[in-house]
Design a protein with these regions (language model features):
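N-terminal pre-Walker A segment at the start of P-loop NTPase domains
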Residues: 3-38
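N-terminal secretory signal sequences
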Residues: 4, 21, 35-36, 58, ...
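A broad, low-specificity signal for short, low-complexity segments enriched in glycine/proline
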Residues: 7-11, 36-41, 111-114, 131-136
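P-loop NTPase motor core of the ASCE superfamily
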Residues: 38, 42-54, 60, 140, ...
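Conserved P-loop NTPase motor cores
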Residues: 47-66, 82, 96, 100-189
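Post-Walker A helix-loop "phosphate-sensing" segment adjacent to the P-loop in P-loop NTPases
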Residues: 67-77
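Short, surface-exposed beta-edge/turn micro-motifs
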Residues: 73, 111, 209-211
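Short, aromatic/basic amphipathic alpha-helical patches
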Residues: 86-98
């Protein structure tokens, strides 16, 4: 029986959808290929770093900035949406001179790495129509033109505005919990589930702490790599970040 043109196109669409489903399943089920951290970071680009508390998300972002500075001579902006002057000065004294702490997006430089720590504070899904969110959308849209690498740090994507999620070129996980995959956005649940299983399969807390799972959204596939903390990372630096988070929670900032 000869297919009519309409039926033929319908079958093509079914095959196309099946092919896309196979590509999706292959990416989820395949073993992540091993790469170096620097090789998988896009420049310019937008990277989202997610995972449980105290798993090294901020330390990872600082290592990426260190790599980009040593290889490309890029300065870095450490953007903290809510930080008092006392903590800002303390932080600035510890980090390298080529990294500047700011609370204002107007101070983001061209051709730089921008670390947006606890991005959910001002890129929250519930605030998607606010002036802050609209301004952030505009900055993401021109990140390529301004030659910026923007690193968003958050526990999981459900906290973030959808426009931020769709702008990313890479997603990097540091060990998530089962709750993270359970309460993720529907679009991200399978990916976070894979991340949970990936880290569960790594023996030893030290090995888990070093490991990263990376989703390449441009080529749609998973990679794995290890990271280490940059030379300036100390317990004091970690405590400052924790104090800022506690301070913001007491002020009623949504995290």
């Amino acid at each position: 029986m000869k297919l009519t043109p309409k039926e033929s196109q319908t079958n093509k669409l079914k095959k196309y959808r099946q092919q896309k489903s196979e590509e999706y399943a292959r990416a989820i089920m395949s073993t992540p290929k091993k790469v170096s951290l620097y090789s998988i970071i896009p420049y310019p680009g937008v990277v989202m770093i997610m995972g449980d508390i105290r798993t090294g998300k901020t330390g990872l972002a600082h290592e990426i900035a260190s790599e980009m500075h040593s290889r490309r001579r890029l300065p870095a902006i450490l953007h903290m949406p809510r930080m008092d002057e006392k903590h800002r000065r303390s932080l600035q004294r510890i980090i390298p001179s080529w990294m500047k702490v700011t609370t204002k997006r107007s101070q983001w430089k061209d051709r730089a790495v921008v670390i947006y720590d606890e991005a959910a504070q001002s890129a929250h899904a519930r605030r998607s129509q606010s002036g802050d969110a609209i301004e952030l959308d505009d900055l993401l849209a021109i990140a390529g033109q301004r030659e910026q690498l923007i690193l968003f740090i958050s526990h999981y994507s459900r906290k973030l505005d959808l426009n931020v999620c769709t702008s990313v070129h890479r997603i990097i996980w540091k060990r998530p919990t089962y709750a993270h995959q359970l309460w993720e956005r529907d679009e991200m649940a399978d990916f976070t589930g894979k991340a949970y299983d990936f880290f569960k399969g790594i023996k030893g807390r030290v090995a888990q702490k070093k490991a990263c799972l990376v989703l390449d959204m441009e080529n749609f596939g998973f990679c794995q790599c290890n990271n280490k903390l940059p030379p300036w990372w100390t317990d004091r630096l970690s405590r400052i970040f924790k104090e800022v988070q506690i301070q913001n929670s007491r002020r009623g900032v949504i995290l």
